[in-house]
A protein has these predicted regions:
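Generic detector of short, locally flexible boundary/turn motifs and exposed helical patches
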Residues: 1-2, 36, 42-45, 126-132, ...
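Conserved catalytic cores of soluble enzyme domains
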Residues: 1-102
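Terminal amphipathic helices with adjacent charged low-complexity linkers/tails
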Residues: 78, 82-140
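A generic structural signal for short, non-catalytic loop/turn and secondary-structure boundary residues
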Residues: 5-8, 115, 167
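Short acidic (Asp/Glu) and glycine-rich catalytic loops that position anionic groups and cofactors
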Residues: 47-48, 67-74, 114-123, 173-176
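Short secondary-structure junctions and interdomain/linker hinges
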Residues: 10-13, 23, 97-104, 129, ...
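Non-catalytic terminal/interface segments that mediate subunit docking, oligomerization
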Residues: 131-180
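Short secondary-structure boundary micro-motifs
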Residues: 17-19, 33, 61-62, 108, ...
Length: 180
């Protein structure tokens, strides 16, 4: 009841560290980001026993609603290996997002002009062969102030990249096709 009025006003992030079934799954999937701990998090409206009873299909809870499956479904923003990694990702996201819709995004010190002038990687990024593939994530990493990009829904659409980073100290969002 308190969550929905805050939607769109302040960042809402859920961490899934165990099983969530039935109506309990509605709260996390209505937040802006859902971080799930691999091999621990599961969420489904109807569990495997009911599926087996109604349809005859024998499916495990991980196959039905495990973290990796929910990432493929688009319900989970990121799957991380541990609870500590989940909390680290929340901290990283909050470092990039404004506290409310009325606030500016946080700004950090930009790299010095000397650091930028010395970086020649962008000049050699594109392959000479127009049919050769390249990893767009490498380009986004080079465009950003540092090498720390926060990729969201990495496995939902592997041909697309959605990530947060910083350029000149300001938070930016990247949405890019990935030809690799």
């Amino acid at each position: 009841r308190r969550q929905l009025p805050l939607s769109g006003r302040s960042p809402q992030i859920s961490i899934m560290m165990g099983k969530s079934a039935g109506g309990a799954v509605y709260a996390p999937v209505t937040t802006d980001f859902v971080i799930a701990v691999d091999e621990e998090a599961e969420m489904y409206v109807t569990g495997p026993n009911v599926i087996r009873e109604v349809t005859g299909e024998d499916i495990t809870s991980a196959e039905l609603g495990g973290a990796r499956q929910q990432e493929l479904n688009g319900n989970v923003s990121a799957v991380v290996p541990s609870e500590d990694d989940a909390f680290d990702m929340v901290r990283d996201l909050l470092d990039h997002l404004p506290l409310t819709c009325f606030d500016e995004s946080p700004e950090f010190a930009a790299p010095s002009d000397a650091e930028v002038a010395e970086d020649e990687d962008l000049n050699a990024f594109m392959p000479d062969d127009t049919n050769a593939g390249y990893d767009m994530m490498d380009l986004l990493t080079q465009l950003g102030d540092d090498e720390d990009l926060i990729e969201i829904q990495e496995n939902f659409a592997p041909n697309m990249i959605t990530a947060f980073g910083r350029i000149d100290g300001k938070t930016v969002g990247f949405v890019a096709n990935n030809p690799m």
